[in-house]
From Swiss-Prot:
Gene coding for it: serC
Organism field: Hamiltonella defensa subsp. Acyrthosiphon pisum (strain 5AT)
Superkingdom: Bacteria
One Gene Ontology term, aspect cellular component: cytoplasm
GO biological process, one term: L-serine biosynthetic process
Name of the protein in its database record: Phosphoserine aminotransferase
Cofactor(s) listed: pyridoxal 5'-phosphate
Amino acid sequence: MPLIYNFSAGPAMLPAEVVFQAEQELAERKKKGISVMEISHRSEFFQKIAKESEQDLKDLLNIPSNYKVLFCQGGARGQFAAVPMNLLGEKKTADYITGGYWSKSAILEAKKYGVPNIIDASVRKPISGVFFQSIKPISEWQLSEDAAYVHYCPNETIEGIAIHAPPIFSHHKDVVADFSSSILSCPIDVDRYGVIYAGAQKNIGPAGLTVVIVRDDLLGKAHQHTPSILNYQVLADTQSMFNTPPTFAWYLSGLVFKWLKDQGGLIEIQKRNREKAQLLYSTIDENEFYLNQVAPTHRSLMNVPFSLSTSTPRLDELFLSEAKKRGLEGLKGHRAATGMRASIYNAMPVEGVQKLTEFMVEFARRYG
């Protein structure tokens, strides 16, 4: 069976080496009588998996010692609620930067617990007579004086917009970031953040796990009505095992962390990701048949949306069906958008992007 390249925004491809290792270890059930999917999270065997995976993640991101790593459930949407419940404290407001769909979704949830100060950072920027989506410089974000924290999403998966600049503000702010679609794609200066959270299903592992990295001094501030399963202090005190965690997703994520270390770490991964993105964006920009409407300075390295210049529902469906015949799947854009989207996370090999761009050139030649 030929390899299928999955360009879906998530769940995404897993590294082939990780899938093979998991297959081998599951096959050992015949010898051991039990598999990693069946063991207790309290067992010595799984405790070793949990500790190793946490340490490997700390090594990859160079996480300082005054941060806790939590392995949770509920996805990023769960964190949209957990963040204000844990961090607002006695304050009533927090700064929320909007740049796309997911940051707006975080705001909708935050409104249940406080009054978010909404800063619209999106802007349409003219380049050679054409307007492109972009993001205002961080220096122009009008933050409030009394906000408990500032929340933003460095990579918007639907629009394909990224905020590459680090969050440096003129006065101290606890910064909270939704890194769901870009975590582990490049080095992160963790100590610039109070909280980092990410759903696993893009760059970490399979769906079902959520990683939260929280600075120690932000623990113990949760509202009294915060559900225990979302309370950072409770999760930290119980080593992320207040309830039964998604053990198999945690185990597979641990294998991904080891794979990333074996590849040379995040500097090497970032180099590969830039190579893949450059190949895809160049194909789009050099061919009038395709269009990406994000300013080059804010293009995502993970999610590349594009449309056909002569787009019709029939032509779009033809593009998707012919791509699927070539083992290129998951290219349909999000339901809230139109056109196509290629998500090229860490596990997507450069060969997959090469195969996609070759198909795109061929399709444009035939139908352009």
